[in-house]
Amino acid sequence: MRRFRVWPPSPSPWPLLASRPCPHSHHHRSPFHASANSGARQGNFILPGATAATLVMFGILHARRMYEDQKVVERKEKGIEPEFSPDFKASFLRLLPLRSMSRLWGSLMEVELPVFMRPAIYKAWARAFHSNLQEAAMPLEEYPSLQAFFIRSLKEGSRPIDADPNCLVSPVDGKVLRLGELRGPGTMIEQVKGFSYSAASLLGASSSLHGAEEEDFSREHTEQSNPADSNAKSWWRVSVAKPKLWDQTLLSPKKGIFYCVIYLHPGDYHRVHSPVDWNIIKRRHFSGHLFPQNERAVRTIRNLYVENERVVLEGQWKEGFVAIAAIGATNVGSIKLYIEPELRTNRAGSKILNSQPEPPDDRVYEPVGTGVMVKKGEEIAGFKMGSTVVMVFEAPVVSKARWREDGSGTVTSDFDFCIKAGDRIRVGEAIGRWTSRE
């Protein structure tokens, strides 16, 4: 048998740095490394670097949210309405590779988390962003990644849909930022006090909105140029059973064009539902920037919703034109369409030069002219995190007033919003109603 001589360790030239056994070293092992003996019982586990980075990003997002919430509270207490005021930070954001950063964040979001850590991470997120975990359709342990958790479905019945046929419902959970009526071609939507953008720029040059605007404007202009015709008693009819005067405008109702902007916070439910029964005729994908969409960004970045990446669904419902724009943001570049799973947003090959993105990618759904029929409340899309949805739609506009003997009277919109700016709303709740006409 061969013998091996074991040499004693040479003295260290730096005694203070010499390796010495620690009498309590067995009490200070890393929590993420098991010894050989304990490994047989518990298994070895090393925290992935991607998971650690995800936790760090989670902490940063939480701190940023707390800071922004405090600023919002202070402004509300002072009664100050946010105004548009560009700053250096907004200009600096254009220099950052936000699209690449968002793709990296998306990769981190897809990292599978250890089963025993999932409840703790998801509960921490829920506390930070006010999410209701009781509505989740599955136990927390069954969501393998943060992305799966963010786009989670809800328990059946969590979002009852208003069944009134004369109403539109909210497509998302979120905060109502802006709402109103568009009057005439080229009408602007207010982004924030002091700055507006056109609905045509948001939806695209080939949008069917242009035809709806021109038709509505032409009808209104014709009525204003012939006021005598609308007041003439020859238009009235009398019911023999119950004498009553009817105005011709009630027999031939007009259509108005309305809009509603809803912001989804990171803690909100992230799926987009259909606001009405409608036919989705075309899809338009704009490859753009991925600026953030928090309150600071809204009041400092020009054309925020127009420049950001977005997917526009456009079609027809029983009252006319309707469109939904799902707008991406930093870390939310991926917009998923359930009616078109193959669509990919925030693609690496997309180029944006001199703030001019590539032309939009259009698709007309088959059968042409009919498209895809979706019911009110049906899921149609989803975000990875918080973002913004803009609805533009036609709704009935008729005269509720009766003309007096002197020919005077008032004209009001038959469609009324049930909500106002600043309200919190959930999927399925009515955003507006109109009265039935005989």
Curated annotation (Swiss-Prot):
Residues 1-21 form a transit peptide. Its cofactor is pyruvate. Binds 1 pyruvoyl group covalently per subunit. Keywords: Decarboxylase, Lipid biosynthesis, Lipid metabolism, Lyase, Membrane, Mitochondrion, Mitochondrion inner membrane, Phospholipid biosynthesis, Phospholipid metabolism, Pyruvate, Transit peptide, Transmembrane, Transmembrane helix, Zymogen. Pathway: Phospholipid metabolism; phosphatidylethanolamine biosynthesis; phosphatidylethanolamine from CDP-diacylglycerol: step 2/2. It is an enzyme of class 4 (lyase). Its EC number is 4.1.1.65. One of its GO terms (molecular function) is phosphatidylserine decarboxylase activity. The keyword Transferase does not apply. Residues 68-438 are mitochondrial intermembrane. The modification Pyruvic acid (Ser) is found at S387. The chain crosses the membrane at residues 49-67. The active site is at D173 (charge relay system), H273 (charge relay system), S387 (charge relay system), S387 (schiff-base intermediate with substrate). Residues 22-48 are mitochondrial matrix. Is synthesized initially as an inactive proenzyme. Formation of the active enzyme involves a self-maturation process in which the active site pyruvoyl group is generated from an internal serine residue via an autocatalytic post-translational modification. Two non-identical subunits are generated from the proenzyme in this reaction, and the pyruvate is formed at the N-terminus of the alpha chain, which is derived from the carboxyl end of the proenzyme. It catalyses: a 1,2-diacyl-sn-glycero-3-phospho-L-serine + H(+) = a 1,2-diacyl-sn-glycero-3-phosphoethanolamine + CO2. It holds the Pfam family PS_Dcarbxylase. Belongs to the phosphatidylserine decarboxylase family. PSD-B subfamily. Eukaryotic type I sub-subfamily. Heterodimer of a large membrane-associated beta subunit and a small pyruvoyl-containing alpha subunit. Catalyzes the formation of phosphatidylethanolamine (PtdEtn) from phosphatidylserine (PtdSer). Plays a central role in phospholipid metabolism and in the interorganelle trafficking of phosphatidylserine. This is Phosphatidylserine decarboxylase proenzyme 1, mitochondrial. It comes from Oryza sativa subsp. japonica (Rice).
